[in-house]
Structure formats: C-alpha cells, structure tokens
From Swiss-Prot:
It comes from Pseudothermotoga lettingae (strain ATCC BAA-301 / DSM 14385 / NBRC 107922 / TMO) (Thermotoga lettingae). The lineage of its organism: Bacteria, Thermotogati, Thermotogota, Thermotogae, Thermotogales. Its EC number is 3.4.21.92. It is an enzyme of class 3 (hydrolase). Keywords: Cytoplasm, Hydrolase, Protease, Serine protease. NCBIfam families: clpP, PRK00277.1, PRK12553.1. Its main location: cytoplasm. SUPFAM superfamilies: ClpP/crotonase (SSF52096). One of its GO terms (cellular component) is endopeptidase Clp complex. The gene is clpP. It catalyses: Hydrolysis of proteins to small peptides in the presence of ATP and magnesium. alpha-casein is the usual test substrate. In the absence of ATP, only oligopeptides shorter than five residues are hydrolyzed (such as succinyl-Leu-Tyr-|-NHMec, and Leu-Tyr-Leu-|-Tyr-Trp, in which cleavage of the -Tyr-|-Leu- and -Tyr-|-Trp bonds also occurs). This is ATP-dependent Clp protease proteolytic subunit. The keyword Transit peptide does not apply. It is found in: Cytoplasm.
Amino acid sequence: MKITDQLIPTVIESTGRYERAYDIYSRLLKDRIVFLGYAIDDHVANLVVAQLLFLEAEDPDKDIQLYINSPGGSVTAGLAIYDTMQYIKSDVVTICVGQAASMAAVLLASGTKGKRFALPNARIMLHQPLGGAEGPVKDVEIITKELLRIKNLINTILSEKTGQPLDRIEKDTDRDFFMSAYEALDYGLVDKVIESKRR
C-alpha cells in the first residue's frame, strides 16, 4: 500500500435524517467529475474507464469532466482510456491541473473539441513512447516494430487532435517537448486557458 492510499480524504454529507461518508473521488463522481491524479497503469486505467462507462450509462447526454494531473505512463493503458473517451456518447471535458505529460497529454488533447482546458500554471509535455527490448535478435525486431507502430499511432492521434501537421508532431515528440498552458493553447492541445470558474 502506498502512503497516498492512506491519505484519501473522506467527505461527510448530512441531511436531516442521516449522514453519509464518501471518499473524495466518489463524491466528485456524483458531480460527474473523474480525477486522474496518478501515473497511468492498467489499474488506474481500469478505474477511469469504469467511471466513464458508469457516468455515460447514468446520463449519456451530460458532460463528464476529466481532471488530469499525471506524469503519463503505460501507452496501452492510456489507449484504453482514450478509446473509451471516443466510444462513449457523453462529451468528455478535459482539464489539466498541474501537469499532463506523455500519455496524459494525449488524453488531455482527446477531450471533446471546444471543451479542452488547462489552468494557467499547468505544464504539458509530449514525447515519443518509451520502451526497450532485449533477447534474441528476432524478438528485438518484433518489439521494435511494435514500438514504431505505437509511436506512429500516438503521433497520428496528436496530429488529428491538435491540427498540427504529422511531420511537426514527429519532430516535436522526438525528445521531451514541454509547453506552458498558453503554449499548449497555441499548439492546439487545449481550447482555452481558464483562470477562474468565477469568470
């Protein structure tokens, strides 16, 4: 068990008749908010996918808000979230708080067009998928071919979602490519930088 697992706040709601305790993530879910605040692995992806499917089943015509503060992670796990976002009927509003790096940046850009946001001090980072291979040469060839396929897939998604030419995406993702919220806006990763919900 990670230390952060022990620090999840509980929210208590009171009505005239009873009290009910929720962990903070369950309480946010009541308001159609999903919070991706960890590195993306299969476990995290399964939780996010389940929440997206639940909220769509509850009301497919209402938006789902996906808040992102993640360093990225597993591409295959991230693609499970991406595919679900594209599959469900509900619009998915993406909001970057803190950072959206690597696969998390792909998810940020994959929200519903016109509904992709970043807070002013957010950081977004793109790069090529990471991987490695060892073993017999034939196995290394197989793994290399798959890594190149995934790299091309991610670059194609980013090109479609940002409107940037594929060759620019390929150049920019060749190494870590950091952007401020406003640079991400100019790049087409987000549609607006939001300073306050009050405005």
